[in-house]
Design a protein with these regions (language model features):
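Charged, surface-exposed helical/loop "interaction arms" that form contiguous linear patches used
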Residues: 1-11, 15-16, 53, 57
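Nucleotide-state sensing region of NTPase/ATPase domains
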Residues: 7, 36, 41-43, 174, ...
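Long, charged, glycine-rich C-terminal linkers/tails
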Residues: 11-35, 128-132
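Conserved catalytic network of the ASCE P-loop NTPase/AAA+ motor domain
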Residues: 12, 101-103, 117-121, 148-152, ...
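GG-anchored amphipathic helix commonly corresponding to the ABC/SMC/Rad50 NBD signature/C-loop
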Residues: 49, 55-64, 84, 103-126
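C-terminal lobe/lid and adjacent interdomain/linker elements of RecA-like ASCE P-loop ATPase modules
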Residues: 139-202
Length: 202
């Protein structure tokens, strides 16, 4: 629930992700609700088989099929699918291939996992993030600025360049900041200099 809440707030795409599943070994799978007709299911059974179906479509896909066909094992399930003479449509949770995400979508996915883990732990710890917008487009940058940083923790430390948090993003996040520091390397004196304020204010 925590993951889906923040992911939807940031990604803001319809029919992109419907649910998340985390197994006992902390393997994470994302799912989307998808409509299949009985002929599609029969073709899947005949063409790719049980093992490849579960790998491609996910554990929850089979859980839904077991419940809908009221069977308990795959042999009975496949027989039921093959013997189904009626044309029916089924809404099934289908695994999403994360490898097909764009670089920005993958980064948002990881950021949201961190957010969900922190919220689920119910432990308040500082959150530190470096170059938060590396592959993120402008729309999602604004969503991360307004929805993510101010809610992930009571103390968030953001290490950013002036091109990442530009003047537009800075105006959004400014009211929520406690302190700002500009850290620069002094080549002449071979040392790091720290000043109060952000790039636009120093």
């Amino acid at each position: 629930d925590n993951f889906m809440y923040i992911f939807k707030r940031i990604i803001q795409k319809d029919n992109f992700i419907s649910s998340i599943d985390i197994d006992a070994n902390f393997n994470i799978s994302l799912y989307i609700n998808k409509i299949y007709n009985s002929l599609e299911l029969e073709n899947l059974v005949e063409n790719i088989g049980s093992e490849e179906m579960e790998k491609k479509l996910g554990k929850l896909f089979f859980e839904d099929l077991f419940n809908l066909y009221r069977v308990k094992d795959k042999d009975d399930l496949f027989n039921a699918i093959k013997n189904n003479t009626q044309s029916t449509f089924l809404n099934l949770r289908t695994k999403v291939d994360i490898d097909e995400f764009s670089s920005g979508e993958k980064q948002i996915y990881i950021l949201c996992l961190y957010w969900a883990l922190l919220k689920s732990s119910e432990i308040e710890i500082p959150f530190i993030i470096d170059t938060p917008y590396a592959r993120i487009d402008d729309t999602h940058r604004n969503n991360i600025t307004s929805e993510y940083f101010s809610t992930i923790s009571d103390q968030a430390i953001i290490l950013s360049t002036n091109t990442e948090i530009d003047e537009k993003s800075y105006k959004i996040i400014k009211p929520k900041l406690s302190n700002e520091y500009l850290i620069e390397y002094d080549n002449k004196n071979k040392k790091t200099i720290q000043n109060k304020g952000y790039f636009f204010e120093v």
